[in-house]
Design a protein with these regions (language model features):
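Fungal secretory targeting signals
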Residues: 1-19
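N-terminal cap/lid segment of alpha/beta-hydrolase-fold proteins
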Residues: 19-91
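Catalytic active-site module of serine/aspartate enzymes centered on a nucleophile-bearing elbow/loop
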Residues: 339-377
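Alpha/beta-hydrolase-fold enzymes
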Residues: 194-279
């Protein structure tokens, strides 16, 4: 049952798919965060965007440090678009909250492709009895949008994820309360999740970071491989986002950044290019703000990334020269940043690219995640 119409606006109807009941939600939240102030104008032209990413990908450079001139408090009332799913028999014992990465919206976790073959939500709910909550990150999709440099940054988005979690734990959305909540992230969503549990270590009972590592050396490959352009240059997005947003400018860019060679169906690439979303320069400038420091989180922690991940492995997670060959793969190097995690696991998925859920190897990734959560949460 719903508790408060003032706090929740329901979509017109629930969606019944297989053995689950799903409902689209629009959830108002009051947020405050300490954001960076960057000395850069909104990116309006293709030259603006290209120059930005050339500076971002510059070897030995740190564009965020170069541009930051201080910090300020950002506050406001926003709305978050989400989808809540439970098994037909009723809510599961554990709620999984999932946060997507750059270029996606919440459909990343439940894409309607090939009879939901690539849906992590379907596996988690239908086959394993979990409840799930997917959401469009603040600034993306059907959630509130905002100013693209100094408002929509990782700090405000972490505040949104924390508030969303509290609303479900405290029964202010549905009367059912969850005593155990786990957080899953992909890419930027993993960086958010990492920051969330470092800031609020008791907010989660376990985390899964997909498409993630603690190696920043390869972000320039993603920045330049994405062929980013102003959102006005992307017909499918131009009417949905304001000036200042950016998005991938070609299907080959999406292929480069998200798919491993021979590990994907071309129809999935087509779907992703047609349904891809925009992002803000403010997000890109702050994505590294939560990493590089030891995390205080003490719960079960899984880092799982594709072998051919471009931004976090440079296209080969087993090439370890960037860390002086200290571990057998780049994902295992994350362990030192989780000194309190119990347990910690690092897994590399063979052949998979950065878009872990969308490759032929997705089944192995899903099995690994669900086995970890069932064993430890």
């Amino acid at each position: 049952m719903l508790q408060s119409a003032a706090l929740l606006v329901l979509a017109a109807a629930s969606n019944v798919v297989s053995a689950r009941w799903c409902r689209d939600l629009t959830i108002p939240v009051s947020l405050t965060s300490r954001n960076a102030v960057f000395d850069i104008e909104p990116l309006k032209t293709e030259i603006d965007v290209t120059n930005f990413y050339l500076e971002l990908g510059r070897q030995g450079g740190n564009l965020a440090d170069k541009l930051v001139k201080g910090y300020k408090t950002v506050s406001g009332i926003y709305t978050l678009a989400a989808t809540y799913c439970v098994p037909d028999k009723g809510p599961g014992d554990v709620l999984q909250i999932m946060t997507h990465g750059v270029g996606f919206d919440r459909s990343y976790w439940d894409p309607p492709i090939d009879d939901y073959k690539y849906s992590y939500v379907a596996r988690a709910v239908d086959d394993h009895g979990y409840s799930t909550l997917t959401w469009d990150r603040l600034g993306v999709g059907k959630s509130s949008h905002g100013e693209t440099i100094n408002e929509i940054q990782i700090f405000l988005e972490i505040a949104a994820l924390a508030e969303l979690t509290r609303k479900f734990v405290n029964c202010t959305v549905f009367e059912h309360s969850y005593k155990r909540v786990v957080h899953l992230g992909h890419s930027f969503g993993s960086a958010m999740t990492y920051g969330l549990v470092n800031q609020y270590p008791d907010i989660s009972n376990g985390i899964v970071l997909t498409g993630f590592s603690q190696i920043p050396a390869y972000m320039g490959l993603f920045a330049l491989g994405g062929n980013f352009v102003p959102v006005s240059s992307v017909p499918s997005l131009a009417s949905q986002y304001a000036e200042g947003y950016v998005a991938a400018g070609s299907k080959s860019a999406v292929h480069t950044n998200f798919f491993g060679p021979d590990d994907f169906d071309p129809a999935v690439l087509d779907w992703l290019y047609e349904h891809g979303q925009a992002n803000t320069p403010g997000e890109i400038l702050t994505v590294g703000a939560t990493g590089g420091v030891a995390n205080v989180f003490h719960g079960p922690s899984l880092v799982i990334t594709g072998e051919r991940d471009v931004p976090f492995c440079g296209g080969d997670c087993y090439a370890t020269s960037a860390i002086q060959n200290k571990t057998s793969n780049l994902i295992a190097a994350s362990e030192e940043f989780f000194p309190n995690a119990s347990p910690f696991n690092a897994t590399v998925i063979p052949k998979a690219g950065h878009g872990l859920n969308l490759g032929y190897s997705a089944d192995l990734a899903f099995d690994t995640i669900l086995e970890f959560l069932e064993a430890h949460v």
